[in-house]
Amino acid sequence: MDLKWLQTFIAAAESESFREAAEHLYLTQPAVSQHMRKLEDELDMRLFLHSGRRVVLTDEGRLFLPYAKEMIHVYQAGKQKVSQWKQGYSRSLTLAVHPYIASYILPRFLPAYIQKHPHVELSTHVAGSDAIKQAVEHNEADIGLSRKDPNTNTLYYQHICEGTLCLAAPFQESRPDAASVLTRYRLLTHDHPSYGDAFLDNIRSHYPYLQMMAVGQTDTAVHMMKAGMGASFLPTYIIKQEEAEKKLMAVSTPAHLELPASQTFMMWKRNSEDIQHFHAMLHDFMQREQV
């Protein structure tokens, strides 16, 4: 059996169209029809019924479809394993990470991890906190790194760092106080999951004329502050890096604002040796860096 026949069958089943399957696979429509005839002959069953310009799966076709997908998956997984072996990798870890962690923590942590574990292939995808939890639960990621407590019974998880927040503003030579910063700039909000509406309500109660603008992501807030468009409460870890380059600066914050802590959580589903090594190194790194 030719795997190309299976790929064509799956494409036609999902699109319900030989024409669309041909476009998706860069084949001619007659080639798609030929693949289906050969597959039906091989299996001794009819897979499709024609309905106008569309095709629909027969009962046999519906039964066979998940097995066709599994055969393609096994083939691709085996091919990937051989490719990893040729590149010198013997194991792999997939990370689902919060945007803040991807931008500000992993670039400083991963070089040390890779140097110590050169045979582990790493892949990452960036997602929101809820999507990170779902990715680990559904085995789409081995490790999740989030700024939100997953609060679940289905995963292992650990709070690996509690950092601090501070008020950040565009850099200037003389250091202003919080009142002058919040008078001069709009406060960029909802860029970090460590605080919520209660914290913002407390700020409003002390600075009733303060203007706010929701931006959604830490990176967005940092870039907007560098452009002089606002101030924000961000992890001290970020501000230390930006202040050294004279791009942003930390501003002393009055105690009555009661700054929340900046949290980082790691979650995982299976207790493999590779995951435990990753956890131990990341925990030590976060404690040293006080992220």
Swiss-Prot record:
Keyword Transcription in record: yes
Biological processes annotated in GO: regulation of DNA-templated transcription
One family name in Pfam for this protein: LysR_substrate
Domain annotation HTH lysR-type: ranges: 1-58
Superkingdom of the source species: Bacteria
CDD domains with a match to the protein in the record: PBP2_LTTR_substrate (cd05466)
Signal peptide range: none
DNA-binding region: 18-37
GO molecular-function terms, A-Z: DNA-binding transcription factor activity; transcription cis-regulatory region binding
PROSITE patterns: HTH_LYSR
Alphabetical UniProt keywords: DNA-binding, Transcription, Transcription regulation
Family per record: Belongs to the LysR transcriptional regulatory family.
Protein name: Uncharacterized HTH-type transcriptional regulator YxjO
Species, as recorded: Bacillus subtilis (strain 168)
